[in-house]
Amino acid sequence: MASMKKASQETALVLRTCSADLTSHGGFQWPDKIGAVVEAPDWKKDNKCGHGLHGWLFGQGDHGCSSTVGEADAKWLVVEVGLSDLIALGGKVKFPRCTIRHIGDRASATQFLIANEPRAAGVAVIGATLQAGDKELCQVGAYGTATAGDEGTATAGDKGTATAGDE
C-alpha cells in the first residue's frame, strides 16, 4: 500500500470504484498508476451528474451512484482533489481533475483513505471494516463491516454487517 502525507486543508481524499479494467461510466479509462494526474475530457462546471470525474468525498455518500461498488473484482481508487474543484451532487461529488493516491481492493482503499484523510474519521465510509472496543460506537457505510465490543454499538449501511457484543 502506498503512503502519503495526510490530506491538506486545501485538498480532500475521495473514494471511488471502477471496473476491474479501470474503466468507468461511458468507457472512461483510469490510468493504473499511483501519482497520475487525471483530467475529465468532458468537464462542465455545473451541478448535474456527468461531465466530470465522480466519487465519494471522505468516502461517504450514496453507494447507488456506482454500478461497480458491489463487484468482487472492482478496483477501488482513492484520489486527491482540490477542495475548490469539488461540486456536491447529493451522495457524491464531481471534479475536473485529481491525482490518484491509491489503487486496490475495497479493504486496502478504505484503510488507505481512513489513514490519510482525517475527515473520514467522522463519517460512515463506504466499504470500510472497523472495530471498536467495549461501550464504543463503530459506524461504516454500505458494504462495510462494523464490530463493537460489549455494550457497544455497531452500525453498517446497506449490504453491510454490524456486530456488537452483549455481555
Feature map (PLM): residue ranges:
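Short, glycine-biased loop/turn motifs at secondary-structure junctions and
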Residues: 1-167
